Regions:
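Short N-terminal amphipathic alpha-helix/helix-capping patch enriched in small hydrophobics
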Residues: 2, 24-27, 54
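ATP-binding glycine-rich phosphate-binding loop
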Residues: 9-32
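Active-site catalytic-loop/activation-segment of kinase and kinase-like phosphoryl-transfer enzymes
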Residues: 130-137
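Extreme N-terminal tail/first-helix region
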Residues: 1-8
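ATP-binding pocket architecture of kinase catalytic cores
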Residues: 33-126
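Residue-level "edge-of-site" marker
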Residues: 19, 74, 130
């Protein structure tokens, strides 16, 4: 089933995969293909109707050269697909590790990233109402 899901990406044969314990809401797997290392996400929670917005936003940020885990489109152009009856995304595996204790340099880097994020989305035709607006309160 996994090999059939991965074939349309045209990234080569499956070499290895393993689950990632650090996921918070979704099931995530490291996937090694002939073309490199990736993360496969099976979306377990959240509103499925929000997924196209998230995919489009991450694509926009990737196009702006921000280091984000964007959804890779398959050969048919579809980035949001289905595996085992769940929405699924294949993303590049980003380098790095989780920071356990942030310092001033980390905060500077986050500030710079947020500035670049705002610039990248300032003219984006993307819109999604907040889930935590006044009606939520």
């Amino acid at each position: 089933m996994l090999e059939a899901f991965l074939a349309p990406y045209r990234l080569g044969r499956l070499k290895a995969f393993r689950g990632i314990a650090e996921g918070t809401e979704n099931s995530n797997f490291f996937v090694r293909l002939e073309a490199g290392e990736y993360v496969l996400t099976l979306v377990e929670r959240g509103e499925q109707h929000d997924l196209p917005f998230v995919v489009a936003l991450l694509a926009r940020l990737h196009q702006a050269h921000l280091p984000v885990a964007f959804a890779i489109p398959a050969a048919d152009g579809q980035a949001l697909r289905e595996l085992a009856g769940k929405p699924a995304l294949l993303q590049p595996r980003l380098p790095g590790r989780h920071v356990q204790q942030a310092n001033a340099q980390h905060c500077r880097e986050i500030g710079g990233f947020l500035a670049r994020l705002h610039l990248a989305t300032a003219t984006a035709p993307l819109h999604k109402p907040s889930d935590r607006d006044l009606n939520w309160m």
